UniProtKB/Swiss-Prot annotation:
UniProt-recorded name of the protein: Ribosome-recycling factor
Organism domain of life: Bacteria
Signal sequence bounds: none
Gene name tied to this protein: frr
Annotated family: Belongs to the RRF family.
GO biological process, one term: cytoplasmic translational termination
HAMAP family: RRF
GO MF term (any one): ribosomal large subunit binding
Amino acid sequence: MELNEVYQYTKEHMEKTIDAMKRDFATLRTGKVSTAIVEPIRVDYYGTPTPLSQVGSVIASDATTLVISPWEKNLLKGIEKAIQEANIGVNPNNDGDVIKLFFPPMTSEQRKEIAKDAKALGEKAKVAVRNIRKESNDKIKKLEKDKLITEDQSKKAHDEVQKYTDDYVKKIDDMVKSKEEEILKV
């Protein structure tokens, strides 16, 4: 392993952490409803747990309503059951053609609670970034111990990994701040 590989590993894994946090953020409810809130839901499709988006279309018809149109009408009951089991805070309204999910406007208490969740997801991402830093630094130490790099190169490499860490922690902080503002905005 070379230093470039360590840098690449560090960047790739820190970027994956950001991507994972973005996916987690997408499931948080903001002032307007998002189709991402139902993405984790799996529907029993002929015995196979299948993502909701693969058995029908999901659209936000307005700020508080999601409409799910299954491609096969016989899936309506299964979709309805999956939504109830997912416990996303709404009851599905099945009209025989589509399923509508009506999300009530959020109270300020709910907004504060969801903003706290966003902050917790940010902290989780920062811990992941710091763990990646530790793994990268361990790899650098091993390269130095195996005499593949000099002490000076090792010091520079540790500084470079710390720079990546600082950059990604700042990105995470900025994303959390932006998400909190979006959640708390009425």
